[in-house]
């Protein structure tokens, strides 16, 4: 579709980090080495379908992101679960800011920061603690990841491996058909 060549796969590559339930179809495609080409293709694919966006940020980025979003009048909710567990959730994205959100999604994903776009109907998002050994928890602190529960006619999109792989997990929302 568009410039991307999607392949249907059986499971999400890293299911421990990308926790998505009620999935009927999963598609993947390799992204290009060209930032503008990827952003343009993402915009063509998802511009009319974006519903929600969630991004994980470092504590040092929280204030700047808040200021930037406030200047654009984009509403958001912040979940600050301590240390490195800060999530911005956007439940309503103005159509005028969809391009900005797509660029942010791609930009933070290629830096190995966690971000997900939801498409179609609203999905249920809960933050879930990853179980680690007490020793690892003392070293790195608690770690939370969003758990996404899809509903019919919804999907979520994320980029893995420092911007190399685009994954779409859907529930009867066929956006990859050619």
Residue spans for each PLM region:
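Structured alpha/beta or helical-core interaction and ligand-binding surfaces enriched in interleaved
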Residues: 1-165, 169-178
